[in-house]
Amino acid sequence: MAKGEGNVLAQHKKARHDYHIVETIEAGIVLTGTEIKSVRAARIQLKDGFAQIKNGEAWLVNVHIAPFEQGNIWNADPERTRKLLLKKREIQHLADELKGTGMTLVPLKVYLKDGFAKVLIGLAKGKHDYDKRESIKRREQDRDIRRVMKSVNRR
């Protein structure tokens, strides 16, 4: 867990498998009252989500926040686009990185920090199938090496 990161409410576990994460940035999320209650109850899914830059603002798209059960008429659309709170120079940096490079912004995790909901956004480049196979092969080799070293150290 990164420094200052509170309790993690949701993670996009497959993101590091599907993408090369180049850089991460912490951003706040603009939420309604019933949405923050659902987020605190960990009823959020990042699987299909992504972020985009439009008109100098950062937006979180396709992140599903389940309707709050006691929210009735105050519940917002679960799939609505939510504004991300970033500094202007951070948004400009991300916009420059995204221009024509095959990069995308992927939400990696949502957590609470000092009572506020934060999202860790990753600047990512998609992996090819052979990259994924290579990552799996490397992980299995590391696991085998650790297993052998553990058995050698026990003797």
From Swiss-Prot:
UniProt subcellular location: Cytoplasm
Q: Alphabetically list the UniProt keywords.
A: Cytoplasm, RNA-binding
Q: Which cysteines are joined by disulfide bonds?
A: none
Q: What Pfam family is a match, any one?
A: SmpB
Assign the protein's first listed, main location to one coarse class.
cytoplasm
Q: Which GO terms describe its cellular component?
A: cytosol
Which InterPro entries does the record associate with it? SmpB (IPR023620), SsrA-bd_prot (IPR000037), SsrA-bd_prot_CS (IPR020081)
Q: Which Gene3D superfamilies match?
A: 2.40.280.10
Choose any GO biological process term that the UniProt entry carries and state it.
trans-translation
GO molecular function ontology, one term from the record: RNA binding
Question: Which family is it part of?
Answer: Belongs to the SmpB family.
Task: State the function annotated in the UniProt record.
Answer: Required for rescue of stalled ribosomes mediated by trans-translation. Binds to transfer-messenger RNA (tmRNA), required for stable association of tmRNA with ribosomes. tmRNA and SmpB together mimic tRNA shape, replacing the anticodon stem-loop with SmpB. tmRNA is encoded by the ssrA gene; the 2 termini fold to resemble tRNA(Ala) and it encodes a 'tag peptide', a short internal open reading frame. During trans-translation Ala-aminoacylated tmRNA acts like a tRNA, entering the A-site of stalled ribosomes, displacing the stalled mRNA.
Matching entries from PANTHER family are given as: SSRA-BINDING PROTEIN (PTHR30308:SF2), TMRNA-BINDING COMPONENT OF TRANS-TRANSLATION TAGGING COMPLEX (PTHR30308)
This protein is called what?
Answer: SsrA-binding protein
Species for this entry: Streptococcus equi subsp. zooepidemicus (strain MGCS10565)
- Gene for this protein? smpB
